[in-house]
Amino acid sequence: FKFGIDLETYFHALMTRITGLTGFFSFFSTYRLIKFMKKFDPDVVHLHELHAYFVNYGTVIKYLKKNNIKTVWTFHCEFMYTGKCGHAYECDRWQTECNQCPQLRNYPKSLFFDFTKIMYLHKKRLFANFDNLIIVTPSKWLGLRVKKSFFKERCIEVINNGIDTENIFYPRDTTRLKEKLGINNEKVVLAVAP
């Protein structure tokens, strides 16, 4: 089920850049998602990222809280506990209260205004009394960061990303492949992916 509307996603991205507010738009897409949830009536909702210009996360959180729906939320970045940053890097303002953001021009980009304090406080209020929320992170590092945020009193679990070391990621004899590609054995081949 695709609830997002492409044109609205572009509008959301534009409005984020103009206003500096992230996650406050996509009204029609969000309405479609909530309409689907009402019809489906889930016992549990498992969320991942909600900040790519496709949903009004505040409306979704309010719906889940109001309807007392058990929610597991896997955080893959720091967006939900910072003013706006996907990754705060060395900035630690999110531990007390975001403002005067040093990453204003980074994703999600704001061209004019710094509303990171408003967005930080908005998120903090949204999550207050969300008793049916469990947060999952795919790494210890992110789990420790979440525990330093306003989520520190929440249930936070680390479930590491799984790696299949028997069928997919295992040492292989690469001699033939190197020969085929014209790479001599003196060179090391390193592949890195996000």
Positions of PLM-derived features:
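A short, histidine- and acid-enriched strand-loop-helix "catalytic/donor-clamping" loop
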Residues: 49-54, 75-86, 104-111, 165
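Short N-terminal targeting/anchoring amphipathic segment
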Residues: 23, 35-55, 69-76
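Short aromatic-enriched loop/helix-cap "lid" or pocket-rim segments at secondary-structure transitions
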Residues: 1-2, 59, 83-88, 93, ...
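Carbohydrate-associated surface elements
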Residues: 141, 162
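A conserved catalytic-core segment of Leloir-type glycosyltransferases
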Residues: 1-44
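Conserved donor-binding/catalytic core segment of Leloir-type glycosyltransferases
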Residues: 136, 182-194
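Membrane-proximal helix-turn-helix segments that form the acceptor-binding/catalytic region
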Residues: 65-66, 70, 79, 94-135, ...
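A short helix/loop element that forms part of the nucleotide-sugar donor recognition site in Leloir-type
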Residues: 120-123, 169-183
